[in-house]
């Protein structure tokens, strides 16, 4: 019966050995455990692991010496020309005496790595038929190994092969994992800094934000952005110093460019990393670093801010500890400098636009509105409630498309602000949004205002007029109170939405337009469609992406924010110095119903600001009277058998002698609002004057 190496140890013995070796975290520990096992088994006095590095043609050596620290050599050339090279070409067990060992590999004997021994054995470590090293066993006495002992050593070697491969794989995986984690963290830092700086158009704010982020992530205490001044040979320096971590100091100054380290970077367009000493020949403003930080040695990193081939400025970072500027951190700081360069470019462009706005009033109107709102994607919208968060998420989702949006909500909920936010976030925000209130325009003029008219199209049309749809070409048109649009005008609006074309009044020329429509109403369009007061086809065309604005009573947590914002805005406008609102007032405001929503709240706050004496808002809450909601009257007549709506209205009008409103009017008897009855009469073609 042939001998199986592992059977000699027994199942439990093999399990114990395997478990012991598998528990080792690294190769040094593995070698230590292996040495102890072979000593206890009286198989050898010492053991070592030699790994072959095929790419570099070198070897790594791990050994354990009694009463000594573990021995570890990596990337060794001398070891690579030792016994391990022999088993690579002839994968058999290598066995020799000390004299034979020294004669074959004298360089190893001269190196003192191997103390005098009796017998030496090297068995190949292999995985999937590939030899990647060897396992050394040494006896210090003259006893040779028996065949049985060789077999046991072979068993140990097989286990060590598996464990070594696992440890190496784990090391590679850990390195890869650490690399991925570092890349992930670096990406998060880049995203955070990009988001923080790209919206800053004021240079002071930009530098402050850049400094805050770099200090937070890198613990760098002195951050500056250096730009060339419009004055020749001068530099504008925007600096932030974190002498006090909680209260950083911000400075702006102008200095001479000549002889500065910044000048060197402007010329070379390359990063400069340098250790500064107080005895160095430095420009005055650079020497101030030692005054600021107590004469400590400064490490200075200057990164060019490039926009294409144009040098915009320099990001200057100073730190007392050189270890901050590691290779990894420098690579990340270079990428941060690229983002900062974009932000600086934007800020400089903004400054140029601001300088030219007096000369370009008409052309810059839309751009000025956009820049005024650039610090907030949602302009003047105030709210942190879940209801408003849901609305703003919908705004973000639909803004970049050209889909029609229908904004639904009670009066005073801020439908126009939502429409403006959609426009500002869209690709059409380089042009001004055109607005129109359908309820504020007489029906006879609404068509002319929307579509324009030619000269002489009707009495009083003395000149051609461009309508809102033409003005809104390549932009957005906001139709407020679209539910009040007359029925006879609705088909023409539908045609524009479907065909993107229309005709001016008094003209048969078709005008093409590219308009994104945003409509709003506080009315129930579904009910109006059911009552035949609104066209169903237009409703479905408008209702592509409805956004429901919550009334103020459904987001009471936003009321304190709104109250504070209105108070400070109105006080500033009226020249009042009001800087606080009593907590009890805010609680009371939050518990009110606000049928007029945000608009009503703003009006109440404005009245309170006018009446306040002092710097604390004084609000007389008993003066606020909430109107009862209007309810339709109860009907006092019913339709007779076989009588339709037309016949019923005609009969009641005859009974009231054509009187529609009032306590004895037809609307009261039918249980309808006056406006509802008039709308139905118009739809049914009923002329009350013909009935009297």
Curated annotation (Swiss-Prot):
One of its GO terms (cellular component) is protein-DNA complex. Keywords: Activator, ATP-binding, DNA-binding, Nucleotide-binding, Transcription, Transcription regulation, Two-component regulatory system. The keyword Transcription applies. SUPFAM superfamilies: GAF domain-like, Homeodomain-like, P-loop containing nucleoside triphosphate hydrolases. GO terms for biological process: DNA-templated transcription; phosphorelay signal transduction system; positive regulation of DNA-templated transcription; positive regulation of DNA-templated transcription initiation. Residues 202-344 form the GAF domain. SMART domains: AAA, GAF. Residues 381-610 form the Sigma-54 factor interaction domain. This is Formate hydrogenlyase transcriptional activator FhlA.
């Amino acid at each position: 019966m042939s001998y199986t190496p592992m059977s000699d140890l027994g199942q439990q013995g093999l399990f114990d050995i395997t478990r012991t070796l598998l528990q080792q975290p690294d190769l040094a520990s593995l070698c230590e455990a292996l040495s102890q096992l072979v000593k206890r088994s009286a198989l050898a006095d010492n053991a070592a692991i030699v790994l072959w590095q095929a790419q570099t043609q070198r070897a790594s050596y791990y050994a354990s010496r009694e009463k000594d620290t573990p021995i570890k050599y990596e990337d060794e050339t001398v070891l690579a020309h030792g016994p391990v090279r022999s088993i690579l070409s002839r994968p058999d067990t290598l066995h020799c005496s000390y004299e034979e060992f020294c004669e074959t590999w004298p360089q190893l004997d001269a190196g003192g790595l191997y103390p005098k021994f009796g017998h030496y054995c090297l068995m190949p470590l292999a995985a999937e038929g590939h030899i990647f090293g060897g396992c050394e066993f040494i006896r210090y006495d003259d006893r040779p190994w028996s065949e049985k002992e060789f077999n046991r050593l072979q068993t140990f070697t097989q286990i060590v092969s598996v464990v070594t491969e696992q440890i190496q794989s784990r090391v590679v995986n850990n390195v890869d994992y650490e690399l991925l984690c570092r890349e992930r963290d670096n990406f998060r830092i880049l995203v955070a800094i990009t988001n923080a700086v790209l919206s800053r158009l004021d240079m002071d704010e930009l530098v402050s934000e850049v400094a805050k982020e770099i200090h937070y992530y890198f613990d760098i205490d002195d951050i500056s952005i250096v730009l060339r001044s419009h004055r020749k040979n001068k530099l504008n320096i925007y600096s932030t110093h974190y002498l006090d971590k909680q209260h950083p100091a911000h400075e702006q100054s102008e200095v001479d460019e000549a002889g500065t380290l910044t000048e060197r970077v402007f010329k070379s367009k390359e990063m400069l990393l340098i250790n500064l000493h107080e005895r160095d020949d430095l420009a005055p403003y650079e020497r101030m670093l030692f005054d600021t930080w107590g004469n400590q040695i400064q490490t200075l990193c200057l990164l060019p801010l490039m926009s294409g081939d144009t040098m915009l400025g320099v990001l200057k970072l100073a730190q007392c500890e050189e270890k901050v500027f590691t290779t990894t951190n420098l690579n990340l700081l270079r990428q941060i400098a690229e983002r900062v360069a974009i932000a600086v470019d934007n800020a400089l462009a903004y400054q140029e636009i601001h300088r030219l706005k007096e000369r370009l009033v008409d052309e810059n109107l839309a751009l000025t509105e956009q820049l005024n709102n650039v610090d907030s994607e949602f302009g003047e919208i105030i709210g942190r409630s879940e209801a408003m968060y849901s609305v703003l998420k919908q705004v973000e989702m639909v803004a970049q498309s050209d889909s029609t949006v229908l904004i639904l909500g009670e009066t005073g909920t801020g439908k126009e602000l939502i429409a403006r936010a959609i426009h500002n976030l869209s690709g059409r925000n380089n042009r001004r949004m055109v607005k129109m209130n359908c309820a504020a325009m007489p029906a006879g003029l609404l068509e002319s205002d929307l579509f324009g008219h030619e000269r002489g199209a009707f009495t009083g049309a003395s000149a051609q007029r461009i309508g809102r749809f033409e003005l809104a070409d390549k932009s957005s048109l906001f139709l407020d109170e679209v539910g009040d649009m007359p029925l006879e005008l609705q088909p023409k609006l539908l045609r524009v939405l479907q065909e993107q074309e229309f005709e001016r009044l008094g003209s048969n020329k078709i005008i093409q337009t590219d308009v994104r429509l945003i409509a709003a109403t506080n009315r129930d369009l579904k009910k109006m469609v059911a009552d035949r007061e609104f066209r169903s086809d237009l409703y479905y065309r408008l209702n592509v992406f409805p956004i429901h604005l919550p009334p103020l009573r459904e987001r009471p947590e936003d009321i304190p924010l709104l109250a504070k914002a209105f108070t400070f805005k109105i006080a500033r406008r009226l020249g009042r110095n009001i800087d606080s609102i009593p907590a009890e007032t805010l609680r009371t405001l939050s518990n009110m119903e606000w049928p007029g929503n945000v608009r009503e709240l703003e009006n109440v706050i404005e009245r309170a600001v006018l009446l306040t004496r002092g710097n604390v808002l004084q609000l007389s809450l008993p003066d606020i009277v909430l109107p009862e909601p209007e309810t339709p009257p109860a009907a006092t007549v019913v339709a007779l058998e076989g009588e339709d709506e037309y016949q019923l209205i005609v009969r009641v009008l005859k009974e009231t002698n054509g009187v529609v409103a009032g306590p004895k009017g037809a609307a009261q008897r039918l249980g309808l609002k006056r406006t509802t009855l008039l709308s139905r009469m118009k739809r049914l073609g009923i002329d009350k004057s013909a009935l009297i």
